[in-house]
């Protein structure tokens, strides 16, 4: 029985020569005519893309249609028949679009296609978009709005994937992030710092209006404030770092340094192998899954991987959110975990107290803040609390001012056991959570909260997952892992594909 499938095109290696000659001629002409370098660069790039499209088309032609005979026996013993009609598919590469015709194998037309030799040999992706184009497109999408990506790719490659395609691509890519993360080996012990630092914080992400809600309801300010148009993502980070011993005076000097003063030039330890993760609450089997539980579950796993001998102090540095501290107490090791209140969440409250007590007297207020912060750094939190209460009584604060001061003192009192800053500084521990603050801003806000952006839980979680692989420095490894897993899933008979020989060896040669 004759093959009904036809090759992609009847091209041969020699057909690349005219394009190569055109490129050479263009460069020579540009040199003779004194063409500006940037104009020549654009002309060369245009011809390189043409050459790439032609070369990739040649690859498809040399592979042929994937016709390996009327009947193929699969490794499981099943015999499949070549179907009468060839089947088309689209392959959108960085060089442009291809429409491919392939021989396919199965039991009969209309039934499931079991084996496609052409796809198997070339390990094509499930979607129309090449793995390389997916890589490049998503590397743009994780940093800029989806609508900007087609513009960027169009300017560079003359390829314009739709926004819907990019969103689906991101959702599909995100499916592999969790298994990839779990497969990563722990850093080598000699590459780690002596301290294991853990931190978490929340950041709101704007959600799309529910489908059942009328557009006018979005203008109901009271209802909007009750339903909360944002969902809170809980961001977590783990890293190791070496100690940096400091005195309270050194810290307070850095906090009150004039903007014109240069910071101390001494080298500071650098966080090692910083890992970020973020989770949103979602429903699973009809039950609400907590974002805090998800994030702290991962933090606990990461700490166990990074501190397997439990020989590093685990420093949990956060703000005063009660639910986060409770999660840390539940999920992190009971032994060796030290809770530290981020100093920079205490200092604003000292400022608030100064304003309550001294009003607009900035000089006196600054003096009070300096004194109280220094005393906090010396471990005198109880004395600071007592002093603030005493001053509130002396100044006869009433009403809202009295209540506000009580809140400030209550916050400090509730976190006093996390404010032994004199001990932390002497041990070289960090006392501020700048890493997680920066993560919430860069990881979440810079991508998820741009003007007009609205997300679903699914789309937001997918973006956070894929974005985390880049921020963790794992992008290339993730892409390789994903392609390998997709190949295993899509092509269980790939060993057969590696032995396909639809052309004579002489035809496959690229020699002239």
Question: Each predicted region: which residue ranges?
Answer:
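Catalytic center-proximal scaffold of phosphoryl-transfer enzymes
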Residues: 1-61, 104-512
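An N-terminal low-complexity regulatory-tail signal and nearby short nucleic-acid-interaction modules
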Residues: 62-126
């Amino acid at each position: 029985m004759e093959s009904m499938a036809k090759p992609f095109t009847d091209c041969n290696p020699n057909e690349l020569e005219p394009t190569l000659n055109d490129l050479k001629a263009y460069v020579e002409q540009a040199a003779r005519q004194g063409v500006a370098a940037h104009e020549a660069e654009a002309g060369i790039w245009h011809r390189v893309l043409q050459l790439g499209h032609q070369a990739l088309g040649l690859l498809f032609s040399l592979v042929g249609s994937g016709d390996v005979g009327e009947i193929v026996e699969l490794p499981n013993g099943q015999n499949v028949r070549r179907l009468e009609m060839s089947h088309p598919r689209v392959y959108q590469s960085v060089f442009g679009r291809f429409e491919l015709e392939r021989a396919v194998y199965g039991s009969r037309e209309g039934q499931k296609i079991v084996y496609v030799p052409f796809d198997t040999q070339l390990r094509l992706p499930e979607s129309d978009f090449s793995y390389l184009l997916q890589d490049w497109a998503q590397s743009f999408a994780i940093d800029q709005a989806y609508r900007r990506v087609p513009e960027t790719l169009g300017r560079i490659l003359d390829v314009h994937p739709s926004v819907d395609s990019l969103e689906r691509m991101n959702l599909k890519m995100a499916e592999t992030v969790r298994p990839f993360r779990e497969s990563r080996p722990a850093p080598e012990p000699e590459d780690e710092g002596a301290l294991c630092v853990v931190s978490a914080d929340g950041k709101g992400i704007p959600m799309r209006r529910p489908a059942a809600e009328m557009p006018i309801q979005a203008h109901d300010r009271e209802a909007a404030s009750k339903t909360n148009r944002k969902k809170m993502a809980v961001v977590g980070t783990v890293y190791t770092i070496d100690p940096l011993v400091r005195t309270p005076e050194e810290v307070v000097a850095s906090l009150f340094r004039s903007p014109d003063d240069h910071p101390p030039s001494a080298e500071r330890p650098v966080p090692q192998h910083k890992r970020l993760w973020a989770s949103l609450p979602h429903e699973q089997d009809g039950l609400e899954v907590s974002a805090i539980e998800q994030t702290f579950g991962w933090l606990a796993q990461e700490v166990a991987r990074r501190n397997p001998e439990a020989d590093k102090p685990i420093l949990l540095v956060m703000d005063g959110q009660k639910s986060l501290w409770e999660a840390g107490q539940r999920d992190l090791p009971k032994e060796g975990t030290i809770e530290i209140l981020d100093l920079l969440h205490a200092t604003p409250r000292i400022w608030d107290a100064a304003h309550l007590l001294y009003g607009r007297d900035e000089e006196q207020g600054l003096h009070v803040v300096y004194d109280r912060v220094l005393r906090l750094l010396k471990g005198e939190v109880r004395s600071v609390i007592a002093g603030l209460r005493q001053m509130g009584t002396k100044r006869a604060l009433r009403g809202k001012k009295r209540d506000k001061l009580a809140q400030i003192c209550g916050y400090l009192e509730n976190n006093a056991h996390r404010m032994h800053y004199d001990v932390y500084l002497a041990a070289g521990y960090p006392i501020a959570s700048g890493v997680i603050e920066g993560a919430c801003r860069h990881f979440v806000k810079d991508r998820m909260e741009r003007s007009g952006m609205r997300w679903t839980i699914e789309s937001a979680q997918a973006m956070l997952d894929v974005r985390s692989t880049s921020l963790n420095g794992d992008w290339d490894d993730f892409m390789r892992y994903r392609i390998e897993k997709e190949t295993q899933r899509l092509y269980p008979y790939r060993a057969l594909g590696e032995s396909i020989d639809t052309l004579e060896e002489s035809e496959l040669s690229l020699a002239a």
